[in-house]
């Protein structure tokens, strides 16, 4: 009986200290963060879509998704990045 009580206590302690993934305020935010920008200009013909990184990220960025499904981080303050966004919005 003592063995099963000890096992129950261990399981209870483990369940208490282990938080479910949905308890995190960031669990539903699945957008990636960027830590560096592309140094050059990405060819527009390679770009399929874009999205902005979360405001929770330390570095604001636009993520361009290429036709090969690669994600490329770009500086949202660059003129070419804003032009690409405008072109994608118009199409």
Curated annotation (Swiss-Prot):
Gene3D superfamilies: 2.40.50.40. GO terms for molecular function: CCR chemokine receptor binding; chemokine activity. GO terms for cellular component: extracellular space. Disulfide bonds join 33-57, 34-73. Keywords: Chemotaxis, Cytokine, Disulfide bond, Inflammatory response, Secreted, Signal. CDD domains: Chemokine_CC. Residues 1-23 form the signal peptide. It holds the Pfam family IL8. It is found in: Secreted. GO terms for biological process: antimicrobial humoral immune response mediated by antimicrobial peptide; chemokine-mediated signaling pathway; eosinophil chemotaxis; G protein-coupled receptor signaling pathway; inflammatory response; positive regulation of cell migration; regulation of insulin secretion. Chemoattractant for blood monocytes, memory T-helper cells and eosinophils. Causes the release of histamine from basophils and activates eosinophils. May activate several chemokine receptors including CCR1, CCR3, CCR4 and CCR5. May also be an agonist of the G protein-coupled receptor GPR75. Together with GPR75, may play a role in neuron survival through activation of a downstream signaling pathway involving the PI3, Akt and MAP kinases. By activating GPR75 may also play a role in insulin secretion by islet cells. Belongs to the intercrine beta (chemokine CC) family. This is C-C motif chemokine 5.
